[in-house]
From Swiss-Prot:
Topology versus the membrane: Multi-pass membrane protein
The protein's name in its UniProt record: Potassium-transporting ATPase ATP-binding subunit
EC annotation from Swiss-Prot or TrEMBL: 7.2.2.6
Transmembrane portions of the chain: 37-57, 65-85, 219-239, 262-282, 594-614, 622-642, 668-688
Gene designation: kdpB
One annotated Gene Ontology cellular component of this protein: plasma membrane
The family this protein is said to belong to: Belongs to the cation transport ATPase (P-type) (TC 3.A.3) family. Type IA subfamily.
Highest taxon in the source lineage: Bacteria
Localization terms from the record: Cell membrane
Pfam families per the UniProt record, alphabetical: E1-E2_ATPase, Hydrolase
Amino acid sequence: MNENKGNFANKKMIKRAIKDSFIKLSPKTQMENPVMFLVYISSILTTILYAVSLVGIRDSKSSFILGITIILWLTVLFANFAEAIAEGRGKAQADSLRAAKKDVEAHKIPSIEKRDEITKVSSALLKKGDIVIVVAGEQVPADGEVIDGAASVDESAITGESAPVIRESGGDRSAVTGGTTVISDWLIIEVTSEAGESFLDKMISMVEGAARKKTPNEIALQILLISLTIIFLLVTVSLYSYSIFSANQAGVVNPISVTSLVALLVCLAPTTIGALLSSIGIAGMSRLNQANVLAMSGRAIEAAGDVDILMLDKTGTITLGNREACEFIPVNGVNENELADAAQLSSLADETPEGRSIVVLAKEKFGIRGRNIRESNMEFIPFTAKTRMSGVNYNNSEIRKGAAETVKDYVISRGGCYSKECDEVVARISNKGGTPLVVAKDNKVLGVVYLKDIIKQGVQEKFADLRKMGIKTIMITGDNPLTAAAIAAEAGVDDFLAEATPEGKLEMIRDFQIKGHLVAMTGDGTNDAPALAQADVAVAMNTGTQAAKEAGNMVDLDSSPTKLIDIVRIGKQLLMTRGSLTTFSIANDLAKYFAIIPALFIGLYPGLSALNIMNLHSAESAIFSAIIYNALIIVALIPLALKGVKYREVSAGKLLSRNLLVYGLGGIIVPFIAIKVIDVLITAIGIV
């Protein structure tokens, strides 16, 4: 997916784009862009005028008509090239994805219980609801949910990430994608998509642009451009009638030529943005694909640019995801060494990052070495969501660690006493944003292990930048309100939702939307699906469940919760690029007006020579210079349209002021200079 990341275009893309530029000259394709269709019709008209001029019927010199005709056709081809080069980047990505999509032999079984009754079928014949078994070394034949087994899966063909991932039944890591490869163990998979409707098929369709529809903003802008074009068309037609009348009144033989008026129309129409509008949208989706995010629609990318509420999961986005033991706090006169020893014993079989960190801290702080967990007199008690405790029975003693309330009930039920000192330590740790794990031995509380969430480096600066952009950040966590408040304050988020439930997230999103906000969020579990379906920008993790992917309007192939911030940047960059180039295109008209209008009417009204502020050589050179600039500026702006305007984390007001200065004022100054330079060059080499 990201093999071409950072490249504008390679030789293969450019060759294919040049070829596609000519293929796109068909009337059906040209009609999809009304502004450029006008240039296309104008090119055909001047071609006819040139052919007629060869037999002596002309209102301008044949060489002048030929020159205008060539430049108009080049303008159409340049617009086609801009769109083709943007599509080419998507096609290159689609080619690599298509290589991963091949027909393989699937091992179909009737059910989990009858896994030995294997029928070999083509993956293309699999239907939704079929059950297949895939063993190490085999390719997953279709999208599905793991209903039994656990295995390492190589998803590099889809995500570009070489490190294998774990896929297993149950939980939020059960979704598998057709085209990936099982590299260890085995999986039994229930197919969740029909042939031709797989995740890979959707990816290929999206990156190729086949499934791309114009967004509401694109449609609105295109309506504006069409309206301006119609106005300029009416003005141009009126000018022809007016020039005939003026020529008769002034006793001049020839009115303004049709070729000159066609050149005027093309120069005044918003051809620059008209030529680049489609490529800007395609390039925006391509940049998202290069970030390993699949957008289900262009509308989702635009919505990302308008988002003003970001709902971010604490784990993995704001914190590193693994809490670490940082301190042993004994109570009731217990020695810290005794607490550390008991905490380590209870964690020897605990494979969670938190459990391993307790073992490491005890070793580093007190030199306590891990013991052999296979000793016959050790019975480990695993953590469950119901008991909220784990521990070990060892040498006629019971050691438990877990949530404060759970351990409190455990100690009291055994006739022990839970001290106020322990409550105070628990409250103090919670107020600091940590997680307290209370450790007890038999009916006595030994103390508390302080687990600390490690805030990711640089997140404070990121949230400060988002605040400058007018975006409010909300941390979503299952922690209690005290812990959540402390972490939120340290990370610098604007608000938080503690003890979050699926219903709570959904309600919060609806409340913000009722107030007129656009909300973005990430999710990976089935319980996230309702909130994802409600959010304006919903990024589902690729490692998540099928329900989450179907509810979201984007899928992050890297399954990185922090990607949401990058998605917002890409969305804003897309909107900025479109707005900036629209401003530049319309501002260009002022300079072209001063180049062409005096040149057209100077024969009828010599006094208009005062408007020739660029001191252009002649009427013909003025028209040529303007029409050449009109074509070349499209080519010059293609890299900007594809890469996007550079985005800065500042307020919308400052961005608007800056872009008006750069692209508004620049759109006036640049053509004045460029048209004058072109005029000098074509005069010097004798074109006119």
